[in-house]
Amino acid sequence: MAAKIIDGKTIAQQVRSEVAQKVQARIAAGLRAPGLAVVLVGSNPASQIYVASKRKACEEVGFVSRSYDLPETTSEAELLELIDALNADNTIDGILVQLPLPAGIDNVKVLERIHPDKDVDGFHPYNVGRLCQRAPRLRPCTPRGIVTLLERYNIDTFGLNAVVIGASNIVGRPMSMELLLAGCTTTVTHRFTKNLRHHVENADLLIVAVGKPGFIPGDWIKEGAIVIDVGINRLENGKVVGDVVFEDAAKRASYITPVPGGVGPMTVATLIENTLQACVEYHDPQDE
């Protein structure tokens, strides 16, 4: 069996085009364009690349993009003060603070300072809690982007045995909640899981997010499984690969995401969707 490739690049472009049309319609109706503030502290090269792609996507769809590039020496108090100002700014619908933050700044405190209505990354405990309660509002971008991919490929997830490898707050844990909402029987594995291979071999839908190149061998994949590879790992030769051995897995899976060009573009596309949603649901003038 040769797997069908899930083309995240194409689906992400569709999502962005849909958002751009909605933004044009808003402006034509006399409403303002959504605004996103992107905050980068320090000069981490990978973070700079991610931030640049987010800003570019904003401008492409017609958002107002505001950039805050702060020096490595920025204190936690200064960063929190900026977030307070952005929370109070009525032209800003979304606030994105690029992680990781420099040593000495508490990630949790910073993310919790962002108002839940402007938490377009979907990391605030309020928004994660809404997802757990089956009443999601702004959803974590990577898990939501994966669900969008499955929906756009008309993959019926109800009743599937889904296995999530990796239990991070950014992907693994919220992904498990999204899969429950999507009707899956969901298992989350982590560093203490025994007999990982057994879980993988029984997965109808496998989502891998550990950040280790080639962590899952292709011969572990169940025949006909759907494989979603969230890993983005740069090898010493410069090649970018996922957490799954792609060539081998693609021989057994029914669908598989490539790396690059699979999940990555959907994360940014979902951020754009979330910013529009925040603008419409929380910050537009409400009819009395």
From Swiss-Prot:
Reaction(s) catalysed (UniProt annotation): (6R)-5,10-methylene-5,6,7,8-tetrahydrofolate + NADP(+) = (6R)-5,10-methenyltetrahydrofolate + NADPH; (6R)-5,10-methenyltetrahydrofolate + H2O = (6R)-10-formyltetrahydrofolate + H(+)
Disulfide partners: none
Protein name listed in UniProt: Bifunctional protein FolD
Keywords from the named record: Amino-acid biosynthesis, Histidine biosynthesis, Hydrolase, Methionine biosynthesis, Multifunctional enzyme, NADP, One-carbon metabolism, Oxidoreductase, Purine biosynthesis
Function of the molecule: Catalyzes the oxidation of 5,10-methylenetetrahydrofolate to 5,10-methenyltetrahydrofolate and then the hydrolysis of 5,10-methenyltetrahydrofolate to 10-formyltetrahydrofolate.
Pathway recorded for this protein: One-carbon metabolism; tetrahydrofolate interconversion
Binding locations of NADP(+): G166, A167, S168, I232
Any Gene Ontology biological process: methionine biosynthetic process
A GO molecular function held by the record: methenyltetrahydrofolate cyclohydrolase activity
Subunit structure as annotated in this protein's UniProt entry: Homodimer.
Domain of life: Bacteria
A Pfam family hit: THF_DHG_CYH_C
Cellular component terms (Gene Ontology): cytosol
InterPro entries, A to Z: Aminoacid_DH-like_N_sf, NAD(P)-bd_dom_sf, THF_DH/CycHdrlase, THF_DH/CycHdrlase_cat_dom, THF_DH/CycHdrlase_CS, THF_DH/CycHdrlase_NAD-bd_dom
Sequence similarity: Belongs to the tetrahydrofolate dehydrogenase/cyclohydrolase family.
Entry's EC annotation: 1.5.1.5, 3.5.4.9
